[in-house]
Regions:
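N-terminal hydrophobic or amphipathic helices/low-complexity stretches enriched
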Residues: 1-13
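N-terminal capping segment at the start of a domain
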Residues: 10-26, 174-176
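Cofactor-binding active-site loop characterized by glycine-rich and histidine/acidic residues
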Residues: 17-21, 32-163
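Glycine-rich beta-alpha junction loops
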Residues: 68-69, 73, 176-177, 211, ...
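Thiamine diphosphate
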Residues: 109, 113-116, 121-224
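Glycine/aspartate-rich loop-and-adjacent alpha/beta segment that forms the canonical ThDP
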Residues: 212-278
Length: 278
């Protein structure tokens, strides 16, 4: 896909996020929106995956370590064709397979259940080690939150990844600077993030995580990197794409009411129309 096509898909992903969280009356729109461009690039450009064959052995693996941003993952999966887009409106509903955190047993395309912060990267490291042991060609990607990396388990897993020289592993940090109870550097600062990963023998790339040119260049660089895992520090805007949600910590885990939903969808519809005119 070219940049414009990716932007169009990302806008649809954002619409799905807002629609699902509004329908659920609960969820995490802020971090889902900030990572929407990453989700889009992974599923529509980077990863070797097939919605018609979700268990194929050589597929690339993705672990959403910051599992609370499941609305973003679900919306990308729906756009890719893993399940109907209409099912997004069942998020968190009784009997729905789309619950608040990813469930590998019930959701097509989900490689690992997640939710407890810090654990997803460990699963991803294990998958990458297994790939090396099997001489398999697949790559493993995991998306972490910047607040999540306050968890010690993240660094235990990173130590192992660097030690094992897992060049089939890409760790992406959604660095939107906000977590549920405030700015991350005021709660428990993880900065400098890049220096920490470098200390564990990672190749580190800093990018604007809402810019497809930079996203594309970073993933190409990661694929060309040999002998060490890659960490992409994606500097993003929490709530990206919906003006009143951007950089507002209150939208970490709050669903829009009917009026806010209408405003958000109108903004995204206009953004989509503008992209179609390019």
């Amino acid at each position: 896909m070219n940049k414009l096509e990716l932007q169009k898909v990302a806008n649809e992903v954002r619409k799905g996020i807002i629609t699902s969280v509004h329908a659920a009356k609960a969820g995490h729109p802020g971090g889902s929106l900030s990572a929407a461009d990453i989700f889009t690039y992974l599923y529509f450009e980077e990863m070797n995956v097939d919605p018609k064959d979700t268990e194929k052995a050589d597929r690339d693996r993705f672990v959403l370590s910051k599992g609370h941003t499941a609305p973003g993952l679900y919306s990308a999966l729906a756009q890719k064709g893993y399940f109907p887009v209409e099912d997004l409106e069942t998020l968190r509903h009784l009997g729905s397979y789309l619950q608040g955190h990813p469930d590998m047993k019930h959701i097509p395309g989900v490689d690992m259940s997640s939710g407890s912060l810090g654990q997803g990267i460990s699963a991803a490291v294990g998958m990458a080690i297994a790939g090396k042991m099997d001489n398999a060609d697949y790559r493993v990607y995991t998306l972490l939150g910047d607040g999540e990396i306050q968890e010690g388990q993240v660094w235990e897993a990173s130590m192992m990844a660097g030690f094992r020289k897992l060049d089939n592993l890409v760790v992406i940090v959604d660095n939107n600077n906000l977590q549920i109870d405030g700015a991350i550097d005021e709660v428990c600062s993880p900065y400098p993030i890049d220096k920490k990963f470098e200390a564990f023998n990672f190749h580190v790339i800093n990018i604007d995580g809402n810019d497809f040119d930079q996203i594309d260049a970073a993933f190409k660089e990661a694929k060309a990197t040999k002998g060490m895992p890659t960490a992409i520090i994606a500097h993003t805007v929490k709530g990206k794409g919906v003006s009143f949600m951007e950089n507002q910590v209150g939208w970490h885990g709050t669903a829009p009411n009917d009026e806010q939903y209408a405003v958000a969808m109108e903004e995204l519809e206009k953004a989509g129309e503008a992209l179609c005119q390019k």
